């Protein structure tokens, strides 16, 4: 899945950086550098999305149709 999401990155008081994604509640990351914080955030987003998809699919009947849609 490809998506463009917002990463908000701030310096942490104790050093390093933390990052959040406002479009994905609960998605956050941290690291010693901005690059590490972004990588940590990307991993968190992937895990959250995969987990939510698994939860949704568990309740669907077998005959449900799953398609990909593009949003410009």
Swiss-Prot record:
Organism this protein belongs to: Synechocystis sp. (strain ATCC 27184 / PCC 6803 / Kazusa)
Record-linked SUPFAM superfamilies: TTHA1013/TTHA0281-like (SSF143100)
UniProt cross-references to Gene3D superfamilies, sorted A to Z: 3.30.160.250
Family recorded in the similarity comment: Belongs to the UPF0150 family.
GO biological process, one term: regulation of DNA-templated transcription
Protein name (database record): UPF0150 protein ssl0738
Disulfide bond residue pairs: none
């Amino acid at each position: 899945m490809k998506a463009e999401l917002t990463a908000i990155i701030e310096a942490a008081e104790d050093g390093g950086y933390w990052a959040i994604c406002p479009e994905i509640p609960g998605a956050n990351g941290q690291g010693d550098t901005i690059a590490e914080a972004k990588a940590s955030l990307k991993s968190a987003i992937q895990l959250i999305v995969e987990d939510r998809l698994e939860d949704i699919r568990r309740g669907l009947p077998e005959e449900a149709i799953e398609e990909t849609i593009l949003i410009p």
